[in-house]
């Protein structure tokens, strides 16, 4: 999911 990618980048 896009949310996982966002937090993963952070």
Swiss-Prot record:
Expressed in the antennal lobe (at protein level). It is found in: Secreted. GO terms for cellular component: extracellular region. It comes from the Eukaryota. Keywords: Amidation, Neuropeptide, Secreted. The keyword Isomerase does not apply. GO terms for biological process: neuropeptide signaling pathway. The modification Arginine amide is found at residue 10. This is Tachykinin-related peptide 4.
